[in-house]
């Protein structure tokens, strides 16, 4: 959420910055609501001051019969105040809802662009594998090795669901454990295991609500949502809290399944694991001091990249342009892994700095010391990594001519020493 005061004082600047997102934000609506709110507040305060003054005068009159006209007048003033308070409440609710639908302002360093074609590649790592045969896509490899069953997944739940079998299930589990061990033991994140369902306040805190409710799985009969990412419950761990500056940064990692409707992806990635309604992910979340948030973003990005480096998977990092960053983000780097079976790079992680946007929505603050005024923290998060897509990358990059798949060395201890799936 943007700061209403900052928006009021920098309306033209904010409007210009939001236009670079391609976001149609009606800031005239803000002017109207904010103006109405301030006018109603002034009227209410004036009447309350009058009521207090006259009430004091009445209290000094010994013969109350001489004050009946003033008493009747103040009753009328009280009714007017009550009506103004009710009107003010409605305006404030409308203003808050409006602010909840306004996206974050891109940071000054975010590349300006009109679409994903304007994203900027900032680095590459690793050599693409060279095959002496035509590399297959992961869905063919998974089916031929009998480790992925798309047909039965669809039978069980419908389109965009997959049944992992045997070494497929074991490889998925191995990747989860490998990622969590790396982030907790080497990168020093604290592991969390949050609920996989959250309430409306949590979804609002991270920015999924109120604007994107149609993309979420909502539980009928109870106001719970299946989480689209661990970012939601983990960020909301400190909702409504005031942290100590000395404790920052707080770095958390969590494995969860994620649930997404993929409402806008009809006809896209209909085969394989790339776009599923349910998938596993290991998430990285940081609560940081505003002065250090972009340094912490660089560290978080490197932590996510290290998963791919240790697995020997070629990748590139892309700085997303203003039109491609998410609703809550001020800056985002995507990590894209090379998939030879599809002859392209595909996103496997998004690492974002939200600055104080989520913290303001969720009221997550910190104090420099006991006497200091609370300030909003900056929140960061990134995938470390999307597990299913990492499995996809292993199947496609480590496939052999005979149809088998080699296991990356770093993963073999998690696979009971198995070197190859055949």
From Swiss-Prot:
HAMAP family: Ser_tRNA_synth_type1. Keywords: Aminoacyl-tRNA synthetase, ATP-binding, Cytoplasm, Ligase, Nucleotide-binding, Protein biosynthesis. L-serine binds at residues 229-231, 283, 383. CDD domains: SerRS_core. It is found in: Cytoplasm. Pfam families: Seryl_tRNA_N (PF02403), tRNA-synt_2b (PF00587). SUPFAM superfamilies: Class II aaRS and biotin synthetases, tRNA-binding arm. The keyword DNA damage does not apply. GO terms for biological process: selenocysteine biosynthetic process; seryl-tRNA aminoacylation. Its EC number is 6.1.1.11. ATP binds at residues 260-262, 347-350. The lineage of its organism: Bacteria, Pseudomonadati, Thermodesulfobacteriota, Desulfuromonadia, Geobacterales. GO terms for cellular component: cytoplasm. GO terms for molecular function: ATP binding; serine-tRNA ligase activity. It catalyses: tRNA(Ser) + L-serine + ATP = L-seryl-tRNA(Ser) + AMP + diphosphate + H(+); tRNA(Sec) + L-serine + ATP = L-seryl-tRNA(Sec) + AMP + diphosphate + H(+). Consists of two distinct domains, a catalytic core and a N-terminal extension that is involved in tRNA binding. Homodimer. The tRNA molecule binds across the dimer. It comes from Geotalea uraniireducens (strain Rf4) (Geobacter uraniireducens). This is Serine--tRNA ligase. Belongs to the class-II aminoacyl-tRNA synthetase family. Type-1 seryl-tRNA synthetase subfamily.
């Amino acid at each position: 959420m943007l700061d209403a005061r900052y928006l009021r004082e920098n309306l033209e600047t904010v409007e210009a910055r939001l236009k670079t997102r391609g976001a149609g934000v009606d800031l005239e609506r803000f002017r109207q609501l904010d103006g109405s709110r301030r006018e109603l507040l002034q009227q209410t305060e004036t009447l309350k001051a009058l009521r207090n003054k006259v009430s004091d005068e009445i209290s000094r009159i010994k013969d109350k019969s001489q004050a009946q006209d003033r008493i009747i007048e103040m009753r009328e003033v009280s009714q007017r105040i009550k009506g103004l308070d009710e009107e003010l409440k409605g305006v404030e609710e409308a203003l808050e809802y409006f602010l909840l639908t306004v996206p974050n302002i891109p940071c000054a360093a975010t590349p300006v662009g009109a679409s994903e074609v304007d994203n900027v590649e900032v680095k590459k790592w690793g050599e693409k594998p060279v095959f002496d045969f035509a590399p297959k896509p992961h869905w063919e490899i998974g089916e031929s090795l009998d480790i992925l069953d798309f047909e039965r997944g669809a039978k069980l739940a419908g389109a965009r669901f997959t049944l992992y079998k045997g070494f497929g299930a074991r490889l998925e589990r191995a990747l989860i454990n490998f990622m969590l061990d790396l982030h907790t033991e080497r990168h020093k994140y604290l592991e969390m295991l949050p609920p996989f369902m959250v309430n409306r306040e949590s979804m609002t805190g991270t920015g999924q609500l109120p604007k994107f409710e149609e993309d979420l799985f909502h539980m009928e009969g109870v106001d719970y949502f299946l989480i689209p990412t661990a970012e939601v419950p983990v960020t909301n761990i400190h909702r409504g809290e005031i942290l100590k500056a000395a404790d920052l940064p707080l770095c958390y990692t969590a494995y969860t399944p994620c649930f997404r409707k993929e409402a806008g992806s009809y006809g896209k990635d209909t085969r394989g694991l790339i776009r599923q309604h349910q998938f596993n992910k290991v998430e990285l979340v940081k609560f940081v001091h505003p002065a250090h948030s972009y340094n912490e973003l660089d560290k978080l990005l490197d932590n996510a990249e290290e998963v791919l480096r240790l697995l020997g998977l070629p990748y590139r990092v892309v700085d997303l342009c203003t039109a491609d960053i998410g609703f809550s983000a001020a800056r985002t780097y995507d990590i894209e892994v090379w998939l030879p079976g599809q002859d392209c790079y595909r996103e496997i992680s998004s690492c974002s700095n939200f600055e104080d946007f989520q913290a303001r929505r969720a009221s997550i603050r910190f104090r420099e010391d006991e006497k200091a005024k609370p300030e909003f923290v900056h929140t960061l998060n990134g995938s470390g990594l999307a597990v299913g897509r990492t499995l996809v990358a292993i199947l496609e990059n480590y496939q052999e001519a005979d149809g088998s798949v080699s296991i990356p060395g770093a993963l073999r201890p998690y696979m009971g020493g198995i070197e190859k799936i055949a």
